[in-house]
Amino acid sequence: MSTSFENKATNRGVITFTISQDKIKPALDKAFNKIKKDLNAPGFRKGHMPRPVFNQKFGEEVLYEDALNIVLPEAYEAAVTELGLDVVAQPKIDVVSMEKGKEWTLSAEVVTKPEVKLGDYKNLVVEVDASKEVSDEDVDAKIERERQNLAELIIKDGEAAQGDTVVIDFVGSVDGVEFDAGKGDNFSLELGSGQFIPGFEDQLVGAKAGDEVEVNVTFPESYQAEDLAGKAAKFMTTIHEVKTKEVPELDDELAKDIDEDVDTLEDLKVKYRKELEAAQETSYDDAVEGAAIELAVANAEIVDLPEEMIHEEVNRSVNEFMGNMQRQGISPEMYFQLTGTTQEDLHNPYSAEADKRVKTNLVIEAIAKAEGFEATDSEIEQEINDLATEYNMPADQVRSLLSADMLKHDIAMKKAVEVITSTASVK
């Protein structure tokens, strides 16, 4: 293989590389075997056409595209490695020449990782809007949340108030015509929860079981169903039940209901304080780490960050989000219909975060390189064991899923983060 690289602009260039016949011939054989079973020729059973007959009838050139797809990935990666390039986006491949019996020549337009000029990243002084302190109010608030979770809904003989739950039937109409999704039976609605469009819940305050209430509202201009956006609607609503929350007393019995390992309310407060202090400590450390990394990135200069890196990071985030939606049974088409958004609308919110994430990774990688951080065999094994424990899977399975290079990279990145944060101080 012969390779060359022509620089076209900052972080951009063209690789030219060749693929030898000793690589091409096996690829042509695989391409032929792939289609052989479907071939017919006089005097031969289907799927048994000899290669010379095929070449004479169709020409070997018809196999070139499939053969190229077979041999290209390995050839391209070999060229990138030989040239010592750090490519960061999908290349644009073009065929320069593909002649029978000769080596093939291809070109690849590539984007390379930008230069990072590091600034100060050690002994940084940062400000954080966080505290390690846990107050009595924090402990009481946690207990109160648990107390509210144990509340029971009981039938209320009287008017519905904010915070009460009403069980309703409703039928919605616009200009006297009922509309899709405007009907519900035995729906439990907590007044003040904001589940329904603005104004709906407020008009049920004061209603009693057995009442029929005409609720008049206007759909927001931004409502996802365009045929309803901005329109006035009427909902004929029947109140079946009014329920109110009955919250348990704040006493030792409540404490035991919340946590069976404690005997008194005071025991629960002590336990919750320890838990909150541990969580607050972690939150504080995370805030310091985030602020220190952010300052290290701000102190660095990234020379002509390629927009392709941002686009690829956005695509990764969008694909991850849509994958989560599909696992919940929501297809991309359904999601866009339900939300009234487009593919472009989905990409936009991720752009700023993607830009920040790409810059952060580049700077941390540059610090790891500047410090000469590498992963030892024992560190790699420890990382594998830690991941196996975290994801509850055998270590061998983790080892098979992650390449050694990926693990080495992650460990070096962690060391770089450690050198930033361990030397940082809080103003």
UniProtKB/Swiss-Prot annotation:
EC numbers, comma separated: 5.2.1.8
Record flagged with keyword Metal-binding: no
Location(s), subcellular: Cytoplasm
Pfam family of the protein (one): FKBP_C
GO molecular function ontology, one term from the record: peptidyl-prolyl cis-trans isomerase activity
Entries under InterPro entries matching the protein: PPIase_dom_sf, PPIase_FKBP_dom, Trig_fac, Trigger_fac_C, Trigger_fac_C_sf, Trigger_fac_ribosome-bd_bac, Trigger_fac_ribosome-bd_sf, Trigger_fact/SurA_dom_sf
PROSITE patterns documented for this protein: FKBP_PPIASE (PS50059)
Keywords of this entry: Cell cycle, Cell division, Chaperone, Cytoplasm, Isomerase, Rotamase
Main EC class the enzyme belongs to: isomerase
One term under GO cellular component: cytoplasm
GO process annotations (BP): 'de novo' cotranslational protein folding; cell division; chaperone-mediated protein folding; protein transport; protein unfolding
Residues covered by the PPIase FKBP-type domain: 163-248
Catalytic activity as recorded in UniProt: [protein]-peptidylproline (omega=180) = [protein]-peptidylproline (omega=0)
Recorded family membership: Belongs to the FKBP-type PPIase family. Tig subfamily.
Domain note: Consists of 3 domains; the N-terminus binds the ribosome, the middle domain has PPIase activity, while the C-terminus has intrinsic chaperone activity on its own.
Function per UniProt: Involved in protein export. Acts as a chaperone by maintaining the newly synthesized protein in an open conformation. Functions as a peptidyl-prolyl cis-trans isomerase.
Protein name from the UniProt record: Trigger factor
Organism: Streptococcus pyogenes serotype M49 (strain NZ131)
